[in-house]
């Protein structure tokens, strides 16, 4: 593999690193808002996604460190990054839009450029991360729909609900106002899922 110095791939890796780093922080802020609004599970999902973005940023950063001639290096990038901090619903929609841009436009473009410049492993990283971003978008859209339709804590049929605090599980159309076991608020309930 050739060195990255002077390539478009180097700039794209830095853009991706900066974008993922900023997304991580935005999602951390969004988690706090979701928690304040009574959406514990959505807060946890924002935080989990923030952790995913941290890992993506690290992947891109390691490609830079591994493939430049000298460290430290300063890399100039010309890019736009979103600023958003509103309600949980608006934050979910903005997050979905950002994830969509990454997996449909940015990362496929960056992968193609990396491949053209002879960096197949970097191209592969962009493509694999794009697959994750696609799942992030789908999850954010589904959560936004639940918030919009008032279905975060209420469903059309009986389902299993689990308290995120103590693990109590009950079957009902909607989560209770308080957990019968630990007395934590409704905001601590989520759908019970066993996927192991």
Where are these regions (language model features)?
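Non-heme di-metal
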Residues: 1-196
């Amino acid at each position: 593999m050739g060195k990255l110095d002077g390539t478009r791939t180097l700039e794209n890796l830095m853009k991706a690193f900066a974008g993922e780093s900023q997304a991580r922080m935005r999602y951390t802020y969004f988690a706090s808002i979701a928690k304040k609004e009574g959406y514990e599970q959505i807060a946890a999902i924002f935080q989990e996604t923030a952790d995913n973005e941290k890992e993506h940023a690290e992947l891109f950063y390691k490609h830079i460190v591994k493939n430049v001639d000298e460290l430290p290096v300063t890399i100039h990038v010309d890019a736009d990054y979103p600023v958003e901090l509103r309600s949980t619903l608006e934050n979910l929609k903005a997050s979905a839009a950002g994830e969509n841009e990454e997996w449909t436009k940015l990362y496929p473009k960056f992968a193609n450029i990396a491949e053209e410049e002879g960096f197949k492993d970097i191209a592969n990283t962009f493509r694999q991360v794009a697959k994750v971003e696609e799942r992030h978008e789908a999850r954010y859209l589904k959560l936004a729909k639940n918030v919009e339709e008032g279905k975060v804590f209420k469903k059309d049929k009986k389902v299993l609900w689990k308290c995120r605090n103590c693990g109590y599980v009950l079957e009902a159309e909607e989560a209770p106002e308080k957990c019968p076991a630990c007395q934590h608020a409704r905001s601590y309930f989520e759908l019970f899922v066993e996927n192991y």
